[in-house]
Amino acid sequence: IRRQRQMCIRDRNKGYRMNKLPERIRIKDIARLADVSVGTVDRVIHGRSGVSEASKKRVEEILKQLDYQPNMYASALASNKKYTFICLLPEHLEGEYWTAVETGIHEAIATYSDFNTSVKINYYDPYDYHSFENASEAILALQPDGVMVAPTAPQYTKGFTDQLQALDIPYIYIDSNIKDVPPLAFFGQNSRQSGYFAARMMMLLARDEKEIVIFRKIHEGIVGSNQQENREIGFRQYMKEHHPSCTILELDLHAERNDEDNEMLDEFFRTYPTVKNGITFNSKAYIVGEYLQSRGKKDFNLIGYDLLERNVTCLKEGSISFLIAQQPELQGANGIKALCDHLIFKKEVTCINYMPIDLLTVETIDYYHSK
């Protein structure tokens, strides 16, 4: 820029002239060179309307010649604009997986409090697609500045995001990604690769066993999470490629009738007494882990997901062999950061942001800290 301080800048009305510019280029310097008002320069820099094409072109030419980089941080602080974000998450109990996501959301929004940001969290029933539709319609009516959503089934998510796009509202996916409906950014694991990896770990435990079981939580045929479905797809892909002769059994526990879990597990193990290996793709591996403890079954290998307190307890007590973690706090925090970077600081945002696939054992759990 210093070489350009004494450059010939063309003024449409006055031709070329030498300009002595200060070390720090100010908006009023650009306005003088472009022969426009300070307000016009400000509108061009921040992409606002109300500027003629001729004035916009002159300002942009000078900005380019000076390699001017606006101080978006200072501009945002000086602005009185308020930014409202809404997050749409599955309903959950305190202490479950989504509680950690909420923690990340609130911690992130607090760091941007100087920029008049606020966040509201709305919920939908993950086992009821109409609940998602109703919750999304309520968000659209409010027309927030940005949205973060944990997607449900693609066809229902697309109905929501199509309307967000029509309203020019940027949106973030967390937990699971829908490739046919690209967001501003996605934060979460590569679900299929995670399931593929989980199958490999499962078979390191199972060795030559010919039967394994997948435990699910289902309500009226709905698993309640795209990510769980994609993990299972990846899991089955690995098994088909490397252990095609291994039988994969299934036990679907009722999502809303937890009091029946132990009875259903008892019936399963009476029917399949030789099964010694299983996995659950949701965050409630503790349901099976606590059952195994209560029945004194110490010869069963169980893999689960997420560092819920009850899962970690089962891991330490031996009824869960491995836990796969995905840093939910960071997903929530990074989603808010991406919205702020895009809307407030006008930064480019990376679209696909995969979280690591972290494998935790009883020997490593006490030394693990999500980043």
What are these regions (language model features)?
Residues 1-12:
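Single conserved hydrophobic/aromatic residue that forms the stacking wall/gate
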Residues 10-76:
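N-terminal helix-turn-helix DNA-binding module of bacterial transcription factors
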Residues 62, 66, 222-223, 239, ...:
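Hinge/cleft segment of the Venus flytrap/periplasmic-binding protein
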Residues 71-130, 134:
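Amphipathic helical "hinge" segments at domain boundaries
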Residues 90-99, 121-131, 188-194, 216-234, ...:
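Hinge/beta->alpha junction and helix N-cap segments in small-molecule ligand-binding domains
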Residues 146-165, 249-310:
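Hydrophobic alpha-helical
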Residues 156-193, 309-316:
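Flexible loop/hinge segments that line or gate small-molecule binding clefts
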Residues 186-212, 261, 327-344:
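Hydrophobic alpha-helical segments within soluble ligand-binding/sensing domains
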